[in-house]
Amino acid sequence: MEFKYWIVPLAALVPNIVGMVWYGFLFKNTWLQTVGKSEDDLKQGSRLVAFLLTYVVGLILAFGLIPIVIHQFGVFQMLNGVKDLEDVNSALSNTIADLMTKYGNNFRTFKHGALHGTLTALFTILPAIAMNAYYERKSWKYVAVNVGFLAICLALMGGIICQWL
């Protein structure tokens, strides 16, 4: 597997781009209502700071998605710390090289990455946001708007990472 490391910073832009459409146009009024804010409240603070912080968090999400959407990482996770892997001439290194030559591109599609990004959102993001929302006495609309945003972000990011990293 040859990695194109510039893909991760590119994928990290997704939450900013999707957020502009999601919270700026599609669900702006619903979102403002569920968080108890007005448009005037949004004018306070720096948009640049919000963009930069969202980008940093997007980087964290992108790096976290790599082992989720690229199954080939499982082989290396299982063999982490095995000394034979460090020796490029060892039988293990040769076996891994053969394995990666044959199967290194299996399941490396946008569709597969988007699937795992969506599943990650449904099975980790949804429960986390829902738990907090219930304690904060937020509505189901609050959960739906925020989980929907993150599900789309993780699907797109997962697809980008799986296909092109």
Where are these regions (language model features)?
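Juxtamembrane/disordered regions of integral membrane proteins
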Residues: 1-165
